[in-house]
Amino acid sequence: MKYAEDPKEWLLIAGVTGRGKTRLAAAIGNYCRDIGIAVMMVVAPDLLDWLRVGFSPHNPRSFDELFERVKNVHLLILDDLGSQSSTPWADEKLFQLLNYRYNASLPTVVTTNANAASMEARVRTRLTDPQISSMLLMGGFDFWGKADPATTSFARSRGRPPRRG
């Protein structure tokens, strides 16, 4: 829970289904909320659906208003990244969101059961930048698609192998 005490960077929690990624992310969010940090936790496909509703003339909030809210919340927890349908619009919105938060140095927690190879390159580079992101591999998950994740350049650049849950 050290991350929750002072969330400043990004945390990527990766693992197969059923390993506790969402539960851990929710615990981080609840702790941060309890100490007064503004938190938004949303499942990636639900976020995209929520944003699409902003285009409806019957919605009281515009797309821009909804997107700004997600982009600027102090701590964003994006659950199950990679489970959304990959469309050009969805890919672009997710990149815009992550890129904005990356450039603004806003703390972000992302959970995924996708491996690096299945992610769009520009999203992957934001999630795995060793300058701002730490990775927690749940249950020996092989995020990099290699036999030993500690041999990747990401692990070496942080000076330690990825943490395992």
Residue ranges of model-derived segments:
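Pre-Walker A adenine-sensing motif
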Residues: 1-5
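Residue-level preference for the first positions of well-ordered beta-strands
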Residues: 8-12, 38-39, 75, 107-109
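Walker A/P-loop nucleotide-binding motif
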Residues: 7-25
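Short loop/turn elements that form and flank the Walker-type P-loop nucleotide-binding site
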Residues: 6-7, 35, 70-73, 101-105
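Short glycine-rich substrate-engagement loop in P-loop NTPases that contacts/grips substrate
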Residues: 33-72
